Amino acid sequence: MGFRSFLHRLTAPKFQRYVHGDQSLKMVFVINHELKMGKGKIAAQVGHAAVKATLKSGEARPELLDAWLSTGQKKICVKADDARLIEQIEQEAKQHNVLSSKIHDAGHTQIPAGSLTVLALGPDENEKLDALTGELKLF
C-alpha cells in the first residue's frame, strides 16, 4: 500500500465501523528500562514505535488496523528490565502471530547507537497482548 492510500484510509470518512468480534484492541509499547532514558527520549522512541507499528499493520493486517483506529486507538506502555526480555517477548509475539516493531536508537543523544529502546506490539486483541506482557509493570 502506498503512503497516499494509507493517508486516505486514515482520513476518509468511515461509513461503516469495523468491529473485530467482541474483542477490545490495543497497542502495547515495551520500554527498555535498563537504559534509564529521560522522559523526552522515551516519548520520542515510543512515537517512532507507534508510527512504525501502525504502518506495518496497515500493510500486513489492514482490517485489524481499521478496527483499532475506529475504536479509540488504545495504547499502553510497560517496562521491561532489559533488552534480553524484550527480544524474548518479540519471539513469543511471532509465535502467536502478533505484529511487532523494534526501535533501535541512532545514538545521537543519551544512549549508545543500536540500543534496543522500545518494542511495539499490535494493534491486536487485548487478551493476546496481555498474555505476552501482562506480567510487566505499567510505565
Residue ranges and their predicted role:
Residues 1-37:
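Intrinsic disorder/low-complexity detector
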Residues 2-7, 29-30, 69-81, 94-139:
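Short basic, glycine-rich beta-strand/loop surfaces that mediate nucleic-acid
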Residues 14, 56-64, 98-106:
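Short amphipathic beta-strand starts and helix->beta connectors
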Residues 22-28, 32-60:
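Glycine- and Gly-Pro-enriched alpha-helical subdomains that act as flexible
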Residues 41, 45, 81-84, 127:
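Conserved active-site and cofactor/substrate-binding residues in soluble primary-metabolism enzymes
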Residues 47, 52-83, 95:
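Compact, glycine-rich, soluble single-domain proteins
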Residues 84-92:
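Short amphipathic alpha-helices within nucleic acid-binding modules
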